[in-house]
Design a protein with these regions (language model features):
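Secretory/extracellular carbohydrate-interaction modules
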Residues: 2-83
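Short tryptophan-centered beta-strand motifs in secreted/extracellular beta-sheet-rich domains
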Residues: 19-21, 104-122
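A generic beta-sheet turn/junction motif
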Residues: 50, 113-115, 149
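Short strand-turn-strand beta-turns centered on an Asx-Gly dipeptide
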Residues: 121-129
Length: 159
């Protein structure tokens, strides 16, 4: 129920993660992101080297909602204090598939990188797939989860 949650799971390759959760809506108190935007979202972190270098798979609520894949790369920086909102880049799938905004209720979000190819499944539907090898080159770290202004209950798993 906190405005921001960040976590990583120690061990594993960091290339696979799943979150089964119930989205209970926006938190009572909301915080702006480093960019200044206020958004309710739940997501997975893959190859999370640190807070400045990783791949995100985020499921956003609201009218501009849906699943978004993005990298955050800031070479030489490792803490959010150092990089803030710098280094984000949205990745586009060569085969775009629509994904619905996150709404209240039970959900599952899964992501897997295999030989540089990312597949994202939301509530059983393939919503994003494509080659991310150039975007993740050199990243090494665990998988994790992230929430912003989203109340959830659920379970997280990784490889």
């Amino acid at each position: 129920d906190a405005p921001t949650t960040r976590a990583v799971a120690k061990g594993g390759t960091g290339a696979t993660a799943a979150l089964r959760f119930t989205y209970l809506g926006t938190t009572a108190r909301t915080d702006a992101l480093s960019s200044g935007e206020v958004r309710s979202q739940v997501g997975l972190k893959l190859l999370a080297e640190d807070g400045c270098n990783l791949l995100y798979v985020m499921w956003r609520a609201g009218e501009r909602g849906g699943v978004v894949v993005q990298t955050k790369r800031n070479r030489g920086k490792s803490t959010s204090f150092e990089c803030g909102a710098d280094g984000y880049r949205i990745l586009t799938s060569p085969t775009p598939r629509p994904s619905a905004p996150l709404e209240a209720g039970p959900h599952e979000l899964r992501a897997r990188i295999d030989h540089g190819r990312l597949e994202v499944v939301a509530d059983g539907a393939l919503v994003w797939e494509g080659d991310v090898s150039a975007a993740i080159e050199g990243l090494r770290g665990p998988a994790g989860l992230r929430t912003d202004n989203a109340r959830i209950e659920g379970t997280f798993s990784t490889d």
